[in-house]
Swiss-Prot record:
It comes from Stenotrophomonas maltophilia (strain R551-3). Pfam families: SHMT. It comes from the Bacteria. Belongs to the SHMT family. It is an enzyme of class 2 (transferase). This is Serine hydroxymethyltransferase. Its main location: cytoplasm. Pathway: One-carbon metabolism; tetrahydrofolate interconversion; Amino-acid biosynthesis; glycine biosynthesis; glycine from L-serine: step 1/1. (6S)-5,6,7,8-tetrahydrofolate binds at L121, G125, H126, L127, S355, P356, F357.
């Protein structure tokens, strides 16, 4: 029997110390990594529940284990809410991550060696869209498209590559692109060569759910996402579709289980159900609208301070700062900003002369700060502090001044009040 009064603090003080330190770091540092956000206490409560004890291979009503009647309720809630959120008629909430959701789509619809056409990682795509270092670039013949000199997706290039290489699947989506994607144009290109259109909307799923960013579900054969980032849920993946035929649904269901996964993480699925309920609340739309307003305020301020934003600005939650020609690298900028309690990530930019471990760019995003309660003026201030540090990354006095300002701002907007 486990006594209920045993806590990590008393049983494992080393781990407790690390958890406490990370909790404090999240309160004291401003989070600008575009793929990060804060979950609600209710989501964390679900993730820490006894549902973690239950093995539940299969799907609701069709399990390979007994005793699943209550986890069936939890998973069905997640499925139904997810469908409602995106206007989908198919939803799978079992993928452990966005990468595994993407893997499921590839394995369901392709054969090893088939050609896929995806966005280059160096131009704003994702590892799982055909990067050579990823399984998607090893198992499949990956052809990559990019952005033009204005930092915009070159749809003419996408079409030319599609007509030349005849991919079986066109992949749309990104990890570092700040404009609106023309999903209809992608579908038209895919249709020209008889390819599936697969959309990875991981970064903008919350914006899509709130109607702040165009939905790909009207155009794509299948769509995946993570459940954190702008959706503000637990770390995990989902697959959704609208108008998918019975054959496609059967392939997707069977590839997730038993194809690439065994037992689902029922505690995480419960957390997803909570997050989807939160995303259906009226306030979620206002939150996502503010995310975009904050990103635009930050981008415009950085531009005014002399920093280039790839594509010239942002229409979503993120921006890519291009520092080619600047004395500071992305790696050094990340470190300097970290000393000022501003958390960002270095990121390659188009035609980057530096290696992916060094880079000439920074990716910034506003989902997390908006969750804290930041509005436009806060993000203008924050962008000016970022520019101050980037202008003098080795100046300890500047870093100390910015750190003090950031600390005051963080105290004004606690993550968990």
């Amino acid at each position: 029997m486990f006594p209920r009064d045993v806590r990590i603090e008393s049983y494992d003080p080393e781990l407790a110390k690390a958890i406490a330190a990370e909790t404090q770091r999240q309160e004291d540092h401003v989070e600008l990594i575009a793929s990060e956000n804060y979950t609600s206490p209710a989501v964390m409560e679900a993730q820490g529940s006894q549902l973690t004890n239950k093995y539940a291979e299969g799907y609701p009503g069709k399990r390979y284990y007994g005793g699943c009647e209550y986890v069936d309720i939890a998973e069905q809630l997640a499925i139904d809410r997810l469908k409602q959120l995106f206007g989908a008629d198919y939803a799978n909430v079992q993928p452990h991550s966005g990468s595994q959701a993407n893997q499921a789509v590839y394995f369901a619809l392709l054969q090893p060696g088939d050609t896929i056409l995806g966005m280059s990682l160096a131009h704003g795509g994702h590892l799982t869209h055909g990067a050579k270092v990823n399984a998607s670039g090893k198992l499949f013949n990956a052809v990559q498209y990019g952005v033009n000199d204005q930092g915009l997706i070159d749809y003419d290039e996408v079409e030319r590559l599609a007509l030349e290489h005849k991919p079986k699947m066109v992949v749309a989506g990104f990890s570092a692109y700040s404009q609106v994607i023309d999903w209809a144009r992608f579908r038209a290109i895919a249709d020209k060569v008889g390819a599936y259109l697969f959309v990875d909307m991981a970064h903008v799923a919350g914006l899509v759910a709130a109607g702040v960013y165009p939905s790909p579900l009207e155009h794509a054969h299948v769509v995946t996402s993570t459940t954190h980032k702008t959706l503000r849920g637990p770390r995990g993946g989902i697959i959704v579709a609208k108008g998918a035929g019975e054959d496609l649904v059967k392939k997707l269901q069977s590839i997730v289980f038993p194809g690439i996964q065994g037992g689902p993480l029922m505690h995480v699925i419960a957390g997803k159900a909570v997050a989807f309920k939160e995303a259906l609340e009226p306030g979620f739309k206002a939150y996502q609208q503010q995310v975009v307003k904050n990103a635009q305020a930050m981008a415009n301020t950085l531009i005014a301070r002399g920093y280039k934003i790839v594509s010239g600005g942002t229409q979503n939650h993120l921006m890519l700062v291009d520092m080619i020609g600047k004395d500071v690298s992305g790696k050094d900028a990340e470190a300097a900003l970290g000393k000022a309690h501003i958390t960002v990530n270095k990121n390659s930019v188009p035609n980057d002369p530096r290696s992916p471990f060094v880079t000439s760019g920074l990716r910034l995003g506003t989902p997390a700060v908006t969750t804290r309660g930041y509005v436009e003026q806060d993000c203008v201030d924050l962008a000016n502090w970022i520019a101050d540090v980037l202008d003098a990354p080795s100046d300890d006095a500047v870093i100390a001044r910015v750190r003090d300002a950031v600390s005051a701002q963080c105290r004004k907007y606690p993550v968990y009040g």
